[in-house]
Amino acid sequence: MSVTFAQGFSAAGVAAGISSVEGKKDLALVVNNGPLDAAAGVFTSNRFCAAPVQWSRKVVADGHVKAVILNSGGANACTGEAGYAQSVATAETVAGLIGAEPNDVAVCSTGLIGELLPLDNVLAGAKSAHEALAATAEAGTDASHAIMTTDTKPKTVELTGSNGWKIGGMVKGSGMIAPQLATMLCVITTDAVVSAGQMQAALAVAAEHSFNRIDVDGCMSTNDTVLLLASGASGIEPDKDEFNKLVREACASLSRQIIGDGEGASHDIRITVTGATSEDAALACGRAVAASNLLKCAISGNDPNWGRIVSSLGTVPPEVAPYDSNKVTVDVNGVRICENGGAGRDRSEVDMTPREVHIDIDLNTGSDAEATVWTDDLTHEYVHINADYES
């Protein structure tokens, strides 16, 4: 059901002729029917942020969003004033259709960078999507398909609070995924009665521990956007801790689905660093290992090459993550192949047949801070997808 799982939301996904793939659904519309229109958002940290990101940041700033329109088939990034004008025109069209103000409408785009969108197609698609709006499971599924690019499957989540309020969500993302958000568009909906301030606080923490801790290929997008919308249609004001927990669970589920659909990936790699002096230190170490293309290639070949793990680990400056390299241990899928900074058990003992590969690194500093990041292996298929990619 995706974004329509929570009460008070309708959605649609249509083929607007934006994508180069004929007949592909490429435009989604999500409308919050209230009674609340509270909203929160987090956006890309890329300095070349796209026009729709610039627009949507302003929209979300006041904590109110009545609708989100999303397109695949073009990023509308690095398109200057003309691109920004397209985002404004899109918001104005949707606002007119639903009886709202333009600054109540967020705009999201994904696809090829550097080209303007076919605006006539976008605006006509917005009208078609408005006519197709429904609060059904099928409508939510259509919306999740419409935002896909190199994704092989839609990614959705549905959760229910202890007293009946709900969270639903959808995300797109398969490649160009790196920490600090990436090329993903995510819309999460809830029918809980919550304030925009509470939502922003919950989303910021949830994103930091989910979307900001995945890395498919080390490439940061210009367009990533995560929006959390509340309709209040359940009439239920949830326990604050439970609300925060379910938002975090929703983000964790969606981010893991991105890793599970990484472009061409044959292994999902979980890297957990323990025994660090701080969580930031553990995170820096985990990200350094996750960024190693040499390691990703080795994992693709079913080779748990611990030398590539520790060499990447060693690039983290000591002032960022102090540790003694002679005390570091590395386990892969439960087998300790690096002991005290040197060889441990033979790496041929590691079972590499599961889809998930677990790399556990203990810095043994005497402290107990830890962090986990996820990444994928690097395959021939990844190169093929990105050599041939066009929106």
Curated annotation (Swiss-Prot):
Sequence positions that bind substrate: 149, 172, 183, 263, 386, 391
Chief location category: cytoplasm
Function: Catalyzes two activities which are involved in the cyclic version of arginine biosynthesis: the synthesis of N-acetylglutamate from glutamate and acetyl-CoA as the acetyl donor, and of ornithine by transacetylation between N(2)-acetylornithine and glutamate.
Reaction(s) catalysed by this chain's protein: N(2)-acetyl-L-ornithine + L-glutamate = N-acetyl-L-glutamate + L-ornithine; L-glutamate + acetyl-CoA = N-acetyl-L-glutamate + CoA + H(+)
Family: Belongs to the ArgJ family.
Site (Cleavage): 182-183
Pfam families per the UniProt record, alphabetical: ArgJ
Pathway annotation: Amino-acid biosynthesis; L-arginine biosynthesis; L-ornithine and N-acetyl-L-glutamate from L-glutamate and N(2)-acetyl-L-ornithine (cyclic): step 1/1; Amino-acid biosynthesis; L-arginine biosynthesis; N(2)-acetyl-L-ornithine from L-glutamate: step 1/4
Annotated protein name in UniProt: Arginine biosynthesis bifunctional protein ArgJ
Organism whose genome encodes this protein: Bifidobacterium longum (strain NCC 2705)
Annotated Gene3D superfamilies: ArgJ beta chain, C-terminal domain, L-amino peptidase D-ALA esterase/amidase
Residues carrying the site annotation Involved in the stabilization of negative charge on the oxyanion by the formation of the oxyanion hole: 110-111
Gene Ontology, cellular component aspect: cytoplasm
Keyword Amino-acid biosynthesis: yes
Active site: 183 (nucleophile)
Subunit structure and binding partners: Heterotetramer of two alpha and two beta chains.
Keyword Magnesium: no
